[in-house]
Amino acid sequence: MKPITAILIISILLLSGCGSSYEFRETGDLEDADISPDEFASLIPDYSDSLRTLSGSGRAFISEPGRSDRITVDFHSDRQASLVTFRNRIGIEGGELLVEDDSVLIYNRIDRVAEKIALHDASLSEIGSLATINLVDLFNYPVKRSAIDDVFQDNSYYVAETDDGRQITIDRETGHVLDIQMPPGSGAPYSRINYEAYEYLNGFYLPRKITIFSMDGDTRVSLLVRQLQTNLSLPALEIQIPDGIPIITL
């Protein structure tokens, strides 16, 4: 895989040629839930005020038609920006990715190329557009009560349908978000996010494995988190690009 392609895929934020333990089900196969939308929302841990920063490292497994790859990643994120550094299998740093509110800056150290892309610009590839996900929001997916229309259930899960057509699946016992399914034609850069292996860390229940699927379903990227720290003081969330390397705006 070319380094620049790997960076773009990492911008999915972070993620499995590996399978998922939760198998998606249509709500037509489920029964109406015995809880209200308010109760559904209250079951989900909400760290929007208390979880301010994340720092960690892990391994990203990338799977797309005809190829797969494995990359080591280090990341730092607050709620405004996310900085990701990745290395190849032999430990050579390949590049950095900085995701901000309206753009993603990609620096390919191997090819010495820097590109800045508007998050919602038409020139951003489908894979690259997955960079729109902030890491703190990715680890603690925000769910607004006002967006929930209906709730369904089976013996293990509650599934909510939102006013924009998303389906949000949570574990009935823990309230942990397990799966986010986007409707066709939603305009989102991904079709599905899957969460596994929650652990308790410094007052937060956070997933240790996250898988994101591209909109066409052909590409999957999974992050297996090895180390994770919360609410630390972060280094500057910026990329130091050497003099003489222009930033190409696409």
PLM regions with names:
Residues 70-74, 94-96, 114-116, 167, ...:
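Well-ordered beta-strand positions in beta-sheet-rich domains
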Residues 1-18:
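Sec-dependent bacterial lipoprotein signal peptides
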Residues 40-41, 108-167, 239-243, 247-249:
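Flexible, processing/modification-adjacent segments and terminal tails
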Residues 81-82, 104-105, 114, 156-158, ...:
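Hydrophobic residues embedded in beta-strands of well-ordered beta-sheets
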Residues 48-110:
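N-terminal mature ectodomain segment of secretory-pathway/periplasmic proteins
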